Amino acid sequence: MSWLRSSPLRQSLTRTTSSGNGIRPIDAATDCDPRACYDSFCKHWQQAYDIIQHSSAPAPTHDDVLGVVSHLDYMVTLLLVELHNCNKISLADSNAPPTAPCLEYLLSENLLDKLYEWAATTGRYANAVRLEQLKLYELLVSHSRHQLLCHEPFLRPLLKILASSQGEIFPPDLEKRLVILLNQLCVVLMQNVHLLDLFFFSAQTQVQEQIQNGNVPPPKSGTTTNFIIFSLLIPYVHREGSIGHQARDALLLCMALSQKNSNIGTYIAQYSSICPLLVTGLGGLYSRLPNSIEINSIDWHRITPDDVTEIPELNLFMNALEFCNAVVQVAHEMIKQQLLDFMYQGFIVPVLGPAILQTNIDSQISAMSYLDLILRSITEPGLLRAFVKFLLDTEKFDGERILDALVERLNSPDGNLCMVTMALFDTLLGLHCEDLMLELMLKYMLPGKHVPISHRHKINKIDPYLNSTEFFLELTPDVMKRARDLARPKSVNEHQQESALPNELSLPSLPSPVMSKTIGANWNYYGLHTGDSLYANLQAYLFEAHWRIAQCQRDCLKWANSYRYQKWPRQGQPQNRLHNHALELAKQFFIEFGGEGIGGLGGGAAIASEAGEKQLDSLQSIGESSGYESFKWRPADEDVSASSGNGTGSVVVGDHPGHDVTISESDVDGHNISSSLSNSSGRRESWRISHNTRNELLLTDLDFSEDLFAQGTVSLGPFLNAIWGKLQTFTSNSLYVNLHLTGLITRLAWYPLPLIHSLLLRSDIVITSDTPSFHQVLRILKQQIDAELPVTEDSLEIIDVARSSLIDREFRLVNARKGNENSPLHQQQSLQHPHHLQPLPAPQQTGAGAQQRSAYATLSAATPVQATPFSAYDPFKRSNNSRRSISKSITSMFSRKSTLPAPAIAPTPASSGLSQIYAFFTGAASTIMGNNNQQSSNQTHLNSSSSSAVTTCETSLSTQPHATGPGSAQLRTTSSTISTSSGTTAGSGGGGGSGSNSSFSIGGSTQTLSAHSNNTTNSSSTLHGGLDGIGPPTGSFNSEPVSLDSVGSSMGIIANTSGTERSRDLALCAVLLDEWLKELAAIAQEQSIVLVTDQWL
């Protein structure tokens, strides 16, 4: 078929498609004589028809086929000119239909039918002639839209060529033209639904006629009905490239047509194989995904959209998943239900289930990352409902629930697995699904045993929320309060007031704010010096909390149950005996524990009972101080409005007629709660709504004898226990684990449920459980940070660097060119542009006792070091290596060489310029210089002059990428001496990690240097870094490029020399805890507003 490449029709169509929109570029000013065009059209057809009649013998020759194709090319050109003129005429005068003599001749003489019959006899040239026919139909359909479909001389040969294409295997170019034509036909049918029956016919009528007249084979599906366009598109649903995209778009149009025509929906659901094909293809594409992910970034926790785009296997899988999501969204109800059933039984359970339950950690990380990506990608409630059922199913995996397995992985010692798990739970909590929240938290909290009896009446109160705001702000570590005071400008009166304070109340003696480096030029606090950062901006936290809480409240209002502290009578047991028993227990409680509410048991303790089914709890007469309320669900089959003295508003559980019935199942057993599972057929609910209705409750949660003696053993459930366990190790976790941990708890605090608030936001409510409460853990963290990080100048310097690094991290995240620089594409760009190198993680330490690397062991080679927070307007920012710092010049001016043994100095070296001058006069500087002059002569990179012998790290030290090979310097700071020695470290060249069939690389990977632990006794910190080959060698270090975050960070060099590694980690924890407490305070304040509004409504 090489001869066809030079045919006139191919060349003309090539020019047509090259114009951009697939239409031949015809000059609007062209004036053609309609009569001349018609005569030329008739002449070309007569010549082509003569060739057809002449070549009808055994088979046409090469010249015969070429001649017919040439004449067809001229005929198509004349038709396009005529249609173009007709469109201009129709715009000018839309009342009178324009005449099209060429098109009328084409239809009246049955030219297309004769052409099809001749093409069937072309033998080996059949595909070439079919290709030209498809191009002809494509051009006519695109220009005439639905007008030609109404004419039988055009429709009959079109149906014949489509029917003959079923079950055939065509070359790629012919497949492309076929899919394009089918796509155009779907667009036309979507706009003209009344023409749909032309392509949807039964085998007894139109198909049989076509078979008899046109020798067309019957459809291979063997069905009595056939939607021929849909049948031809099915084989291309999983095809790659533009063919697959166009086929899926056309199939979606057919699915949308099924909503308008029930016959189409019935045919697709009952007679086509689209649903099994979609599910099996999705499972096959999932099996091609890498079984393990090679992680090259220390903070990687989920797959980004860039990763999906740049990994071919993942891109194909996500295309198929998004197509299934779209089908469920637009298809007929029968198709939707069938696809959901196939998805659950054929993909979610047999494919995702075993993948998630694997025992290998790498496989678990990859499977959970894929699940997280799936949950973040799908939007259709039906699919989300299926995944919720999958997480809670207890029958498919030998009694083990997927949700329980995920909760156990929160306690994993592997940092990557822990972060991926927390990211997955962040996605799950963001679904605002009632069943998930019930299984994770609410079913353990509903009995109310985690709250003492005397505190249960406080749960629905609103006033204490404001006290909780002050409580969170008071938990700020002392060093952060001092740093905040130094950053805030003080008036003369404030200085006088401070000087008037007693000595025992004054803070430790520190330099004035003017002399301290810890004052950030852009550090914002309550709107002061805001700059561009949102750190310490309480207004930003309030706005975020308001928006998040409002969004969560809108979703929770659709739940089937209101999880509030309510009163409700016991059912099925004698009321008098229950009331008497409760009153006796109440009297014993107040007598034994000296409660203040005993006075309420006098005249006001009469038991009130009402006739009818709706009775109020008799314990209501005890009063608010008794605390004998219990957590109750209101029945879903009736509307109940109950009011009490503790501020509980009325709750009405009504129907949700606009939502689907949920298919998830979750039982609430144990904890003295019995619930009956029932599916209400008369109510259609959202996927977020649980179908559990609590109409029959045992009042055993009022068994105060159990409460009084067993409150200390109440469990909050494995999920909260795992979260609290991680929070207790806050100061030893990595920065990124803490970021995910605080984000997860913050998302829980967004829920407008007083039950959850009693754990997180209410500091006035005592929690009695088998683990320390949330507020107790926060107090312990504050005490630990205050004890290990006292308010000293060195601590404030480290705090300043930690704060600067987090602000710089924020700016880099905001200003990143792409949504996430964790992608493999960013790897390649980083390799191509070394001046944008990002810090990377060093090889992980082996052994059971290996500890996580400190985030302060990193330094960005792209950004100069700053002691103050990053600012584009910082006038003291210097990135030029030729400029030397003032502190270095002063130090070299007063320096003197000494070879005497150095006396012992403080464990933490002075870091500021003025402190170095002071250290010089006290002998510390000479000690450092003396140790430096004892180095060997081959360490030329460290000693170039007498002034460069000072190796104390200064705040103005600059960092640059490596320029002279693997040379490095190791600085060991011990408790008695500071010695500097040069050496070489085994630096491993970076790479993106080669992908394979079982793994692929995610995260920036450009350069890695080995990080070795310091084995020297009494060692407090170790720094590995390559010397800067440009500029003065003194004080120019590159620290170990361990990744601080996915987009890089600028950590001050002072963080590697001032204080121990533990103090630097504590500084990061202090800054993060300070910001998190502000966020929790903002959430508590906004939740009080939400509750007040809810009561008034």
Swiss-Prot record:
Biased composition, class Polar residues, residue ranges: 1-21, 949-962
Pfam families recorded for this chain?
Answer: DUF5917 (PF19314), KELAA (PF19311), RAI16-like (PF10257)
Q: Which residues carry this modification: Phosphoserine?
A: S491, S823
Gly residues compositional bias, start-end: 986-995
Annotated segments matching region Disordered: 1-25, 639-684, 820-856, 932-1042
Q: Where is the composition biased (Low complexity)?
A: 641-654, 824-852, 932-948, 973-985, 996-1006, 1013-1022
InterPro entries annotated for this entry?
A: FHIP, FHIP_C, FHIP_KELAA_motif
Keyword line: Phosphoprotein
Which PANTHER family does the protein's record reference? FHIP FAMILY PROTEIN CG3558, RAI16 PROTEIN-RELATED
Q: Which family does it belong to?
A: Belongs to the FHIP family.
Q: What is this protein called?
A: FHIP family protein GK23746
Q: Which organism is it from?
A: Drosophila willistoni (Fruit fly)
